[in-house]
């Protein structure tokens, strides 16, 4: 696998392709990220690269983290992320990972936390159909049957019910990179990504590439 990059979701916009079709896109402020640790099979048992992103006040970083970050540079970083790689040859501690690592037409996998929607009902959380709204019905947004009675006498684990919705980590795979802006550290990808504007994202080359991507 290749080294990924951390970024921040700025928001959504749209592009128009050569045929005049509107294409929804997401603008991501990606990097630059500093390589804070290089793991090798000799020392750690596997190959990986840890990168850091985002400024942070010194008083918010504990002493062990400060000592760890000082090995790769003077600036403290808010977020750390480790990426498994096949080999760490040519990777230097303290060097930067920028959006130049990606190119238009490339497919990427974007990971992040989905927007939290709080305690939600059956229709919103699971897409259940509602009951009749008229003719004396009192079952508008109720769940319906949740199982049998005396036997089994309980609710089976995994039963879809109301509860907390969102706020979970997810990965959107195979998004196409449409534009790379090296001067402003911007990455424009086709489609939507998890989270609200300002959310932390992890972008890495797609694991499953498939056919050649087209904008």
UniProtKB/Swiss-Prot annotation:
Matches recorded under Gene3D superfamilies: 3.30.160.810, Translation factors
Keywords: Ribonucleoprotein, Ribosomal protein, RNA-binding, rRNA-binding
Highest taxon of source: Bacteria
Keyword RNA-binding on entry: yes
Pfam families attached to this UniProt entry: Ribosomal_L3 (PF00297)
Molecular functions (GO terms): rRNA binding; structural constituent of ribosome
One Gene Ontology cellular component: cytosolic large ribosomal subunit
GO biological process, one term: translation
Region (Disordered), start-end ranges: 124-164
Job description of the protein: One of the primary rRNA binding proteins, it binds directly near the 3'-end of the 23S rRNA, where it nucleates assembly of the 50S subunit.
Assembly and interaction partners: Part of the 50S ribosomal subunit. Forms a cluster with proteins L14 and L19.
Family, per entry: Belongs to the universal ribosomal protein uL3 family.
HAMAP family recorded: Ribosomal_uL3_B
PANTHER family cross-referenced by the UniProt entry: 50S RIBOSOMAL PROTEIN L3, LARGE RIBOSOMAL SUBUNIT PROTEIN UL3C
Protein name, UniProt field: Large ribosomal subunit protein uL3
